[in-house]
């Protein structure tokens, strides 16, 4: 056999091997609620809402959401066989914003740090955009994820919100922590002018360990809505209640979400949580 023929045969074997690996990977690609999960990309899923979560969401006269929807963004290299932290995004109720809408704001900084981003919603609108409505749909979204990836129940979870969403993030985090259904590893609260997290700790009593959860307050130096003074008061309130890891960071800007602050906060959560 000539050297040329031998090279062709070896090269051909390498090509066949590469093709086989590609086909093998394609056959084992992760899916969620019928959607293919591509690392570094985002998907939108639909999922059934169980009676349990419908009962929660429909309080205060809201309709019963039978189907939920969620936007998820995944970091490069994502593989559900490994553990990944999840950033749960909660939006304000102003301007008819939904958490699924706000998820895109956090996508770039969060996925760059190796986090999954989750924003949940329904396929119908509520009569009142209540905390119970948000809780029911978030719970149903987590249930849908855990149905296909049971191991995700043990993944660390942080809550993030801007303005009104930051207040509600604290409430939802305390409620879910009280139920023992999530492993809370941090709160990123931006543009916040009232301490709902501390109040929720006292109301829902998730346990003393909750006071060890790191809290990052992100304040715009020229914010006319959630002023620097308001952020200082929120920090003081949290520390007075007993939160031990409260960090207030200020940036040049107004009432806005600063992407670089999101990234720094997620790095801090990882450092303290050692995950």
Regions found by a protein language model. Give the residues of each.
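Bacterial N-terminal signal peptides
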Residues: 12-23
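A domain-start/cap signature at the N-terminus of enzymes
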Residues: 27-84, 176, 233-236, 246, ...
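Gly/Ser-rich "nucleophile elbow"/oxyanion-hole loop immediately N-terminal to the catalytic nucleophile
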Residues: 76-83, 129-164, 177-178
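Active-site machinery of serine-nucleophile hydrolases
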Residues: 86, 92-140
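Cell-envelope and extracellular/periplasmic
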Residues: 90-94, 146, 162, 169, ...
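Primarily recognizes the serine-hydrolase "nucleophile elbow" in alpha/beta-hydrolase
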Residues: 155-209
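The feature captures the conserved acid-bearing segment of alpha/beta-hydrolase catalytic domains
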Residues: 186, 191-262
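Catalytic active-site module of serine/aspartate enzymes centered on a nucleophile-bearing elbow/loop
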Residues: 262-275
């Amino acid at each position: 056999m000539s050297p040329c023929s031998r090279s062709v045969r070896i090269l051909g074997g390498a090509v066949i091997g590469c093709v086989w690996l590609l086909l093998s990977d394609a056959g084992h690609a992760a899916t969620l609620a019928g959607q293919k999960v591509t690392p570094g990309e985002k998907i939108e899923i639909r999922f059934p809402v169980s009676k349990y979560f419908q009962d929660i969401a429909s309080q205060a006269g809201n309709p019963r959401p039978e189907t939920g929807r969620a936007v998820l963004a995944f970091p490069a290299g994502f593989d559900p066989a490994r553990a990944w932290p999840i950033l749960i995004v909660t939006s304000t109720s102003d301007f008819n914003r939904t958490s699924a809408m706000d998820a895109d704001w956090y996508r770039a900084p969060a996925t760059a740090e190796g986090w999954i981003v989750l924003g949940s919603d329904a396929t119908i609108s509520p009569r009142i955009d209540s905390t119970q409505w948000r809780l029911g749909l978030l719970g149903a979204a987590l249930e849908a994820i855990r149905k296909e990836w049971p191991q995700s129940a043990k993944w660390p979870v942080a809550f993030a919100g801007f303005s009104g969403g930051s207040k509600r993030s604290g409430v939802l985090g305390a409620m879910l922590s009280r139920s023992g259904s999530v492993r809370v590893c941090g709160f990123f609260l931006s543009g916040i002018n009232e301490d709902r997290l501390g109040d929720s700790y006292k109301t829902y009593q998730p346990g003393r360990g909750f006071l060890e959860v790191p809290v990052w307050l992100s304040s715009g130096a020229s914010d006319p809505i959630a002023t620097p003074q308001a952020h200082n008061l929120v920090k003081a309130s949290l520390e007075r209640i007993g939160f031990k890891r409260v960090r207030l960071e200020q940036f040049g800007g107004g009432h806005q979400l600063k992407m670089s602050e999101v990234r720094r906060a997620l790095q801090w959560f990882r450092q303290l949580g050692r995950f």
